[in-house]
């Protein structure tokens, strides 16, 4: 099943309850949508396992009502309580994936900034790294533009949440 929104496309995989959830946890998942009412396997255990084994995965918890035990306090990125529309679900998923993309872009931006600083130092000491330096500067510019583009799509609250997650790393 494909969800194709204006900016975000995602492939959806469903859990196979005939196998252990632990076997299905994959760090490559961008997003987990978790029904907080799930009893077998236990939703709380699934959330804990994903946080331990795939910490980069965004976790959206859905629940019929506000649960007494807050999934966000337990490590979920977002709680969506019912009843909610398809549009609310889609926009929440899109926002979480944009936040994840922003974090990835900023991680690469910071990595390239460090690399640029090292190459500048090597250039000043006479090493022939001009081509590498120009390549990194060009990539850095592209990532800065990409980050600005994503930032423009996030509300102030969404941007602050993405920034907090970056600083928590």
Describe each region flagged by the PLM.
Residues 18, 23, 27-52:
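Conserved phosphotransfer microenvironments
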Residues 105-169:
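C-terminal output/effector regions of signal-responsive regulators
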Residues 50, 55-67:
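A short, hydrophobic beta-strand element within the central beta-sheet of small alpha/beta folds
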């Amino acid at each position: 099943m494909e969800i194709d929104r204006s900016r975000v496309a995602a492939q959806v995989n469903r859990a196979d309850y005939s196998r252990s959830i632990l076997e299905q946890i994959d760090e490559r998942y961008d997003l987990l949508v978790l029904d907080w009412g799930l009893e077998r396997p236990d939703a709380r255990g699934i959330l804990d396992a994903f946080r331990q084994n795939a910490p980069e995965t965004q976790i959206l918890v859905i629940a019929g009502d506000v649960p007494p035990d807050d999934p966000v306090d337990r490590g979920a990125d977002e709680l969506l309580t019912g009843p909610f529309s398809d549009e609310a679900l889609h926009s929440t998923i899109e926002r979480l994936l944009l936040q994840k993309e922003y974090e990835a872009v900023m991680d690469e931006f910071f990595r390239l900034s460090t690399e640029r600083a090292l190459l500048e130092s090597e250039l000043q000491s006479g090493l022939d790294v001009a081509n590498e330096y120009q390549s990194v500067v060009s990539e850095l510019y592209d990532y800065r533009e990409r980050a600005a583009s994503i930032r423009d799509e996030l509300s102030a609250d969404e941007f602050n949440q993405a920034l907090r997650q970056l600083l928590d790393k």
